[in-house]
Amino acid sequence: MTAEHLRLEADRERRLPWKKWGPYLSERQWGTVREDYSEGGDAWQYFSHDQARSRAYRWGEDGLAGFSDDQQQLCFALALWNGKDPILKERLFGLTNSEANHGEDVKEYYFYLDSTPTHSYMKYLYKYPQAAFPYSDLVETNRGRGRNEFEYELLDTHVFDEDRYFDVFVEYAKATPEDILIKISVHNRGPETAELHVLPTLWFRNRWSWQGDVERPLLNQIGASGGVIKAVDSGLGERYLYCDGDAPLLFTENETNTERIFGAPSRSPYVKDSINNYLVNGQRDAVNPDKKGTKAAAHYHLSVGPGECQVVRLRLSEVAPTALTPTNGASPFGKGFEEVVLARQKEADEFYASITPDTFDADQANVMRQAVAGMLWSKQFYHYDVDKWLEERGSDPFKASRRAAPRNDRWHHMYNGDVISMPDKWEYPWYAAWDLAFHVLALTLVDPDFGKQQLKLMLRERYMHPNGQIPAYEWNFGDVNPPVHAWATIFTYRLEKAERGEGDKEWLKSSFQKLLLNFTWWVNRKDRSDRNVFEGGFLGLDNIGVFDRSAPLPTGGYLEQADGTAWMALFCENMLEIASELALSDPEYAEMTLKFIEHFYWIASAMTHAGQDTGMWDEEDGFFYDVLRLPDGKAQRLKVRSMVGLLPLCAATVFDGKVIEMYPEIRERASRFLSARPEIRAAIHDPGKPGVANRRLASIMNEAKLRRVLATMLDEKEFLSPFGIRSVSRYHADHPYVFWAGDQEFRVSYLPAESDTGMFGGNSNWRGPIWMPMNALIVRALIQYYLYYGDDLTVECPTGSGRRMNLYQVAGEITRRLSNMFLRDKDGRRPVYGGTEKFQNDPHWRDCLLFYEYFHGDNGAGLGASHQTGWTGVIARMMHLFATIDPEKMLEAGKMGYVDMLAAEKS
């Protein structure tokens, strides 16, 4: 067991709080719903980047390479100034939704290079131009571009020409859970000496301005010579920031500069932007001469030669200066400082070596490690008391005279105040429940406890609606997202069991009870006609459909969604898996297995049995489509070949016979149910038909349908890209689908890159690109089919190639293609970086990896949010899975038997 594993164990057993401090600062608090108190709900305009340096936040904080405690009481981050910018670089810059041609977009280069799960060691890289940062150029040029044009990026502005920039590395190393060493290494990559002001900044989140019962905390300088900032908070206690070298300490308050923001006199001359005004604007009286406040920075003025590196060292600790006196040989920056940093770095190497498959080469190991590091850096303290927020904006739902709230007034029960895995801490600095389910798959690779805690969090009464709905995201908690929580729950349970030798049954039981509420909400709310056909609404695939699926249809009527119904079939299967696992040790759950067996039969048959002309399955095309049901009773398939039609393939789960052997009445009652309804058995895969080792398969598709869908999916002219499965078939490049509603045209074409519409904000595209989470679900399903059919079912992969594979091999081939987006090819290039030569060839860029939101459907280049390691980080789990699974042993033992075998090896 490595040192990091021991720390995880100590934290789990609550002996030492190794996770108390971490990268829990957001990278963008401005422009969020939480900070929006506007009449119309325009969060981007209400609180802008320009205001952020001067205006105190209500619900959280942000910063560069930020670090805080898990309640975000005390925050640390980096500020930089190159002597030319109009403002301090205190936070990342990006464009708002209306400023960019493809929606909101960060315009900086920064990388999450490393992190252990306890954050005992972390490493971050920020690339800072030596020329003035081109704020206005980025805004104006992007604003002038159309949706069919490329985005104007920071490299395009030429500020990195001749390598005139600084590489600023920030490392955190914990000597103890409360003693944190901070090392900032500044490299001048340019040809000439350049100056840089480095301002490590410590501040308290402003709670006192909003809550009258909160005692105001204090930062103050200790001693006349400086070098130490004392932080005192009634809840957190005392902390000390030790600053190496001769750096003056600058103090102000984390209070709004109301004069600048609102044109009203500020309560204090010392405000949030005072340090900026002191340094950039030369206002020497802007900072507090008494050396106290609630925000402070040490000012290091560096002159860095070409190719030179200079280091700034700090230490945030609960250890008082009196305990660091020379009498006991201690010093905040003595020999022990570097020893701790090197030791934690070495322990991080040992930790990742212990989980990295032996078959991985250095590049594969680097991809996996940086994917996980990005997941760990993307943790954020998320604070949002919706009831208080509504009250503060005059929208209290319990008062008759109230302002209308632009959103979330039905979620007034919610109180969020937790560290949560974010999709992207700049572009999506708020949790998204269905994204989170995929995050957990990667996070459990290194920290099963955190993964379990994240899944359970969404089911707690402070999050889940009393009616059973799981919250979507802050822009509209009531939106409908795919029900993947149960899948992530059973998957996590099995992964932990395989890793630790036993699964957490109590966690599984409590999760199951809450998931029952969510399942009931779905059945009651989303099945309009009580025919087990689900409309769904938004369902997370944004612009994939012919219409905006969360809005009323231009034709009237309603849409029966193939993916909505497939999601519910998968939800049934996952709940059946959980109930079956629990029934092995608790007979109370045996009855629940039958409940979900019957639910699955009804839902699965509804997809294929609604009628030859009006059902979702099209026999001629061998594919599933959404069905438009018009007010006059007519129905029409919307023949778009998209991920919508592949999702029914994903609703497949194999079961062994353990529960049936223990409770034979389940088989008897299920058989009676089917015997009385032969039309159901005829419409789906025969659930009574045995597969390998007498296993059973719950699947919407029988073998004939499966083969036809796979033939389309694995056709390189359709869905199979060199880098995974596309979200829309390439067939639509030359054959767009067109639908007319009156004189209004609706068109779906194959768009392999960015969206050409503003639907759902325009900052994502499901009409062609490759999306990692959907590929992960397809891979999961193929493994399920393999465990049932074994080597008896082989298909051409790619279609028409003559190369036949079983379905495990197909899953491995898709995973290989996905992995190849990030790995160097034979020419040393990473497809994810496309034609960006700096990323392809420069030794200071080429091994720094970004895990984008989605990827070009033809060439694999990264698109969308650049740091959505969130669900794209699942590539780490997929790479690991195919490097460690023995398919022959798994086929022989079965899914649960294989998990039990691995568990026996661990115990």
Stretches with model-predicted labels:
Residues 64:
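Basic, low-complexity intrinsically disordered segments
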Residues 1-55, 72-74, 81-907:
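Acidic, mature catalytic/reactive cores of soluble proteins
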Residues 68:
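Active-site-proximal polar cores
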